[in-house]
Amino acid sequence: MPRREWRGPILNGVLTNPNESVIMRFLSPQDAVAIEDQHTHHTVTQSETVWSGRIVDMVKDHVVVVEGQDPVVREYTRHPGAVAVVVMRGESGAEEILMERQYRHPVQASLWEIPAGLLDIPGEDPRVAAQRELAEEADMVADRWDVLVDYFTSPGGSTEPLRIFLARDLRAADEVFDREDEEATMEYAWVRLDDALTMVLDGRLHNPSAVIGVLATHAARGRGWADLRPADAPWLRS
């Protein structure tokens, strides 16, 4: 993309160059407060699965992103999605969240994370999947579930959506699970929410669900938990 060396004024929501050619269009302040992600349709003229794995597929699409122009090629992984859980206990102002340390081979690092797992059972309710992961990874059950935040893990290269739940009112699970592979060596810690926030801002935590979950939980607490959504709230997924 060619670099533009000029800086034009913003007039009536439009950034213009000295020749008054429209370059960028801005929403009005009134419209900006209502922005929301949404599905949009673009014509795919050709699609092929380049490679299939146990969890993800590599897909190559030829897609028309600008009407009237030739299709462009986009390669991405097709992923079933995942859920994660911020597990919280403690009195107001002294909340603690559960963190677990797990080896992640692709990045060759042991990361402090929150419980999480794949949506690899077709049609399964995301909350049910999150409840299963909490029981399997931490031997706990939660009686209160809310949606904390939703995001796409890497929307430029993957279809993977991820929903983070906030789980409270905890109790021990009836069954203790045998953990295998990387999960067999996990370590656990109850971390004060304020300390977890410091860890994120200090660059000590790198797992995206943990980072986003900590930031969202801290923000939600600061707003009195008023913005939490019900566990079955709508979810933008591909």
Feature-to-residue mapping (PLM):
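Nudix hydrolase/Nudix homology domain
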Residues: 13-33, 37-38, 42, 110, ...
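Short beta-strand micro-motifs in enzyme catalytic cores
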Residues: 57-62, 110, 161-163, 187
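Short, well-ordered beta-strand micro-motif
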Residues: 60-62, 87-89, 166-168, 190-192
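Active-site-adjacent beta-strand/loop module that shapes the phosphate/pyrophosphate-binding cleft
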Residues: 62-67, 154-174
